[in-house]
Amino acid sequence: MHLCGGNGLLTQTDPKEQQRQLKKQKNRAAAQRSRQKHTDKADALHQQHESLEKDNLALRKEIQSLQAELAWWSRTLHVHERLCPMDCASCSAPGLLGCWDQAEGLLGPGPQGQHGCREQLELFQTPGSCYPAQPLSPGPQPHDSPSLLQCPLPSLSLGPAVVAEPPVQLSPSPLLFASHTGSSLQGSSSKLSALQPSLTAQTAPPQPLELEHPTRGKLGSSPDNPSSALGLARLQSREHKPALSAATWQGLVVDPSPHPLLAFPLLSSAQVHF
């Protein structure tokens, strides 16, 4: 308690009033801190909104450029289909370039980024990817001779390292055939020449009977000798035996062999070499 003298007022500090003032100060400080926090948060959100707006604007521009490029590609495809009516499997690279030139002349300069797509398209194209596929094994033509061998054409050439193999020759060579025939004929002629003396010795016609031995009458007249009687019987049976004809001798001489030269003994004896 403070006492003032004279005409001064007597003032006294109340503790409740002091507590009330302290609370007000604390509330003011807390409100200020809260306002500052909200302000900082609002500033951060505003900056984030501005960055998002910039990104959105860039994306809108990119979408517009892509839409313009898509429209240009659609017009190019339409003009290409009208100028070059062909299938995708049978397209060719030179015709494709001509169509692209005509399409560029009709459509004018393309949008931004068209050259990069064009270069990528040319990089992915290969020389043999657009040409029509050739048949693997061409069949025989009706006007070709059946005796000639058809040589299969190489299909789908993969590179310079791949070499077409020559066709296998099915028919035997005439030189080998002639040599084989000559050797077989020489062997058969040598066999015929070896067998000819034995055949002539076996199939020789019976010789005519010689003149009677001077002792024949003596042997036949002596009935006491049995060996002479046996020899006379053999001679008589040989005389009464009929002689074989020439055709029969030829039939005996000819051997039933499948080889054609056995039927001609003159050719077999001459030993003809082919």
From Swiss-Prot:
Record's subcellular location? Nucleus
In terms of InterPro entries, this protein maps to: AP-1, bZIP, bZIP_sf
User: Biological process (GO) annotations?
Assistant: defense response to protozoan; integrated stress response signaling; myeloid dendritic cell differentiation; regulation of transcription by RNA polymerase II
Q: Which residue windows does the record flag with biased composition (Basic and acidic residues)?
A: 37-47
Q: Which domain of life is it from?
A: Eukaryota
- What is the induction comment? By type I interferon. Down-regulated in most hepatocellular carcinoma tumorous tissues (at protein level).
User: Which lineage?
Assistant: Eukaryota, Metazoa, Chordata, Craniata, Vertebrata
Q: How the protein assembles, per its UniProt entry?
A: Heterodimer; heterodimerizes with JUN family proteins.
Protein name in the entry: Basic leucine zipper transcriptional factor ATF-like 2
Where this protein primarily resides, as one coarse class? nucleus
Low complexity compositional bias: what residue ranges?
Answer: 187-196
